[in-house]
Amino acid sequence: SGTSNTIIKVTEGVGWISPVATQQTNTSNCIGYYHFARFGGNVATAQAEAKYFISNLPSRPRYLVCDYEDGASGNKQANTNAVLAFMDVCKANGFEPIYYSYKPYTLANVYVEQITAKYPNSLWIAAYPDYEVRPEPYWGVYPSMDHTRWWQFTSTGLSGGLDKNVVIIGSGLNKKEEEEEDMNFVVRSTSGKQGYVGVVNGRV
C-alpha cells in the first residue's frame, strides 16, 4: 500500500500515438496502458487496433485496457466479438486485458456476460452523479455490475479535471464495507488526448 502507479493512454484507432506516453512512463510506476477503441463491431479492425496498440507500448506493464465508449455498431453480438478479439490479442501477448466503459453504454452495446465469462474481474466502469469536484466516492451511483475491478466515480476528482476511481477488486474483496476500509484510487487526466494518465494509490 502507498504506492503510486499509473495507467497511461498510448493509442487511439490505428492513426494516433500519444506523444507523451514515454515521458509519462519514465516518470511514474506504470502498471498499465489503454487504447481508445474505434473498431465498432469489426473483428479484423479490433485485432489490427490491438496490434497497433501493443506495437507502440513504451514498456510491458500488467494491464492493457480497451476503452470502448464510442462508435459501437448496431449489432450487439458483433460489438462483443470485436471487444473480445481485441482482448484476446492482448492476452495472447502476455497482458491482462481490461474493458473500460460506462454501464449504460456497455449494457446497450455489448453482451458483458460474454466478456466476463472469458475474462473475470476485467471491468473498469464509469458512473458518477454530476460533474462537480468530488474527491470522495458517492456510493449512491455505484454501478453494480459483477466482475467490476475499478469504478470511476467522478470526472472531476480534483479541480482542474481529473478522474478518480475506486479499486473494487485488488485484495480479493468485493464487499462495500471492506472496499471502504481499503480504499485505493485511480486518477486519470482528461485534459485532451495528450493528458491521459491514471494513477493508482494502493494495492492493485
Regions found by a protein language model. Give the residues of each.
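Substrate-binding cleft of extracellular glycoside hydrolase catalytic domains
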Residues: 1-99
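Conserved beta-strand termini and adjacent loop/short-helix elements that scaffold enzyme active sites
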Residues: 36, 100-102, 128, 153
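Functionally critical loop-and-helix segments that line ligand-binding/catalytic clefts
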Residues: 1-4, 114-183
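Generic detector of solvent-exposed, compositionally biased contiguous segments
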Residues: 61, 96-97, 177-185
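Residue-level detector of flexible, active-site-proximal loop/helix-junction positions
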Residues: 40, 72, 104, 132, ...
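Beta-rich nucleic-acid/ligand-interaction surfaces
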Residues: 104-115
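Short, solvent-exposed loop/turn elements at domain surfaces
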Residues: 15, 158-162, 196
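Short, surface-exposed polybasic-aromatic patches that bind anionic ligands, especially phosphate groups
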Residues: 179-204
